[in-house]
């Protein structure tokens, strides 16, 4: 959150040059504050686990956040009771005419299926298109990031010969981006996917900016130049045991998965996992919610169709 300082304080220029978020008394006095409204489209099989992971990150920010949960269809989920879905989730028709400050679209275990062959692909495209007019900023995670890059920019992924699973080191490729404030020069994040985007296509696209990447895992955080869409190719929301649970699930199904890299102690699956990414995940979501949602969204969400703060904002 910003530090409020007197108007024309000499330190302001220095602090701003160091990428410290400060706000003058005049600007602070004219700020209207209300809870942020965030919609979560949960595509993961275990709905409750994913809800908990994302709400944990949202709850770690200093902002009040009102969350709505969205399902892609009303078909019964294999891993979540129909009572839970009916009690806590909304259908798209219930939110179609609403506006939100933020939208999070999760990953999905669909990495080896062509986008057009996904049973609800048309629904995904419809929601992505809707979000570009009804949401200030959208955070796409893993499969959703690949799907959105394909739908919005025509950039397709390449399938991998084996699942990329593990915790990988990443580096910043840009400086002085609000989204990267507080990031270490090198940080870790989990990946669990069967596909990868071509990093050179991402780097050369005029509407996209690669902010962080990994020598082992490729592009990680990509931001649209409009500031509206953030594509995160991994799973910063994962809890400590998630990769372990996925690995053991695949073993039980006879899939012969590779051991997640840089995850178990000494890369030995009989040892406990080592969580190296929780502080990064918390900071990523906090920065997104603060700088790309809270700072850009209109106070009256009904005004969203009449203004585009993300296109004129200088962050």
Curated annotation (Swiss-Prot):
GO terms for cellular component: cytoplasm. SUPFAM superfamilies: Class I glutamine amidotransferase-like. Its main location: cytoplasm. Keywords: Acyltransferase, Amino-acid biosynthesis, Cytoplasm, Methionine biosynthesis, Transferase. Substrate binds at residues 163, 192, 249. Transfers a succinyl group from succinyl-CoA to L-homoserine, forming succinyl-L-homoserine. This is Homoserine O-succinyltransferase.
């Amino acid at each position: 959150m910003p530090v409020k300082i007197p108007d024309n304080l000499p330190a302001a220029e220095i602090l701003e040059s160091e990428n410290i978020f400060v706000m003058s008394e005049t600007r602070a006095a004219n700020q209207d504050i209300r809870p942020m409204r965030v919609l979560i489209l949960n595509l993961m099989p275990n709905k409750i686990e994913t809800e908990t992971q994302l709400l944990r990150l949202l709850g770690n920010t200093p902002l009040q956040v009102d969350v709505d949960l969205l399902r892609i269809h009303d078909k019964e989920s294999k891993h979540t009771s129909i009572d839970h879905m009916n009690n806590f989730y909304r259908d798209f028709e219930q939110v179609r005419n609403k506006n939100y400050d933020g939208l999070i679209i999760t990953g999905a275990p669909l990495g080896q299926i062509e986008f057009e062959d996904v049973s609800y692909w048309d629904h995904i495209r419809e929601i992505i298109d809707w979000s570009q007019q009804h949401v200030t900023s959208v955070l796409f995670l893993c499969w959703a990031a690949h799907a959105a890059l394909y739908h919005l920019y025509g950039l397709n992924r390449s399938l991998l010969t084996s699942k990329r699973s593990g915790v990988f080191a990443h580096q910043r490729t840009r400086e002085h981006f609000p989204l990267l404030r507080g990031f270490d020069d090198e940080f870790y994040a989990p990946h669990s996917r069967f596909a990868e985007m071509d990093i050179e296509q991402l780097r050369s696209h005029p509407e996209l900016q690669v902010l962080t990447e990994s020598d082992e895992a490729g592009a990680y955080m990509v931001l649209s130049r409009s500031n509206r869409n953030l594509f995160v190719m991994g799973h910063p929301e994962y809890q400590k045991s998630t990769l372990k649970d996925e690995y053991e699930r695949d073993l039980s199904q006879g899939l012969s998965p590779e051991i997640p890299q840089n995850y178990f102690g000494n890369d030995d699956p009989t040892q406990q996992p080592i969580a190296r990414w929780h502080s990064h995940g918390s900071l990523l979501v906090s920065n997104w919610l603060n700088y790309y949602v809270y700072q850009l969204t209109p106070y009256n969400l009904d005004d969203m169709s009449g203004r585009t703060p993300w296109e004129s904002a200088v962050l």
